[in-house]
Amino acid sequence: MKKVNFTEMKKGTKKDYKILEKYDKKFERKTADRILKYLKSQTSTLEGYKITRLEHSLQAATRAFKNKESEEMVVATLLHDIGDDFAPMNHSQYAASIIKPYVSEKTFWIIHHHGLFQSYYSAHHLGGDRNARNKFKNHKYFKATINFCENYDQNSFDPNYKSMKLKQFAPMVKRIFSRKPFYFL
């Protein structure tokens, strides 16, 4: 394997960065595989709930698929809580940052804000403001985010629901993450 000559990026040459570009592209092509592997491992999280984190994601994505959402939205729904393990206080933003280069502004916004909107169902039971989402009431994706939470997220904790299998979503994930990125950084 070729390696760069620098120990500080400011001393890198065009040749060095061409070497890295080749490896970066190869790594980027495997993003979907790494995401699917991580999702598959989500079998022991969501303590206190009746289902696993993986099952919650599968239920939510199955509901989106059955509702004939775009493939982009189905994949975003599958990944909407992928940030819970690493960023429990801002999991929505974490998940949104993963999908941002490959999805529309609308899909990004929904996933980015779903955590706050989802608190509508629980905040008032814990001394919080269930209507905190209303600060976005004039935003063009406000209703779409409410619909996302109502139709796919808040109702996907059912141990008796028949979800699609992760392998059924795998080709969709691979197609979305093989798109030419809409955004970079």
Q: Would you name each region that the model predicts?
A:
Residues 1-78, 82-185:
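Metal-dependent phosphohydrolase cores
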